[in-house]
Amino acid sequence: MNEVRLSENSYGKSDVEVFLCLGDDLWLQIIASIKIEGSFEAVYVDGHNSQILPTDTFSNHFEDLASSSQGADLYEIGVGVLDRLMECMEDAKVGSVQLSATRWRRLLGDSNSMVAESPSVEVSMTRGLDGRIEIAGYVERRIIRSSGSSFAGFRRDGLTDKEDVESRILYGDLRASWRYCGRPTDLFESNIEVAERLFAAFGSASSNSLQENIYKAGAMVLSARSDIDEIAISFDSFGTQKIFLKSSDRSNNSRLWRSISRPVGTSYAKVVRDE
């Protein structure tokens, strides 16, 4: 019988939530998930806990840094957590923090109520043993592109029944992640700007396929943002179907559609800079 061994391991704390009051009319909600990977065989295999901090301590460091950060700097908070934890645990090899940040603003005319702004900002920071920090941004949004996307000239076999389409509706979930070359001046605002630029690029680039569309969108983002060295984009597309109205005195004129939620088409591309 072959012997068994521990191959990989990690542990951490998920969904640690705080609200920071940044002013009379502005609060910031931050949700953190913290993970540490390392050589913790003694903990997993032998049950010796002297190598690790309790995960409650992860939460305490996050809350302490969030409360002391000037202007709720996401980079300062995330990297601060990683620095503290990895310096305390000599067997830690890689640390990562995912932060989801949402601004809340007070409703006009109501001194007691606040409402969450959209969108939330999703970022992550990863630190290795060399202290180097890798920063990434994320976005996920359901979008509709009403025209400008064709699909024709594709290969056919005996079971291909799809017709060429000169212009179609694209409706589905757009997801993207990108990696920063360095530290953005304002990580919150930078993520919002990249996401808006991505959506604008996806909607404006004419294309002969969804695959070409997501590549062009990624290339346009990299061309506009020199501080990003790669972006990965995926799109899960739902089918759409024109609704034929039963009333004899009314016509659709391509204004009324329904979504077909299954099956879902998927496309993915990673766009990088040449070395």
Regions found by a protein language model. Give the residues of each.
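N-terminal intrinsically disordered, cationic/polar leader segments
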Residues: 1-275
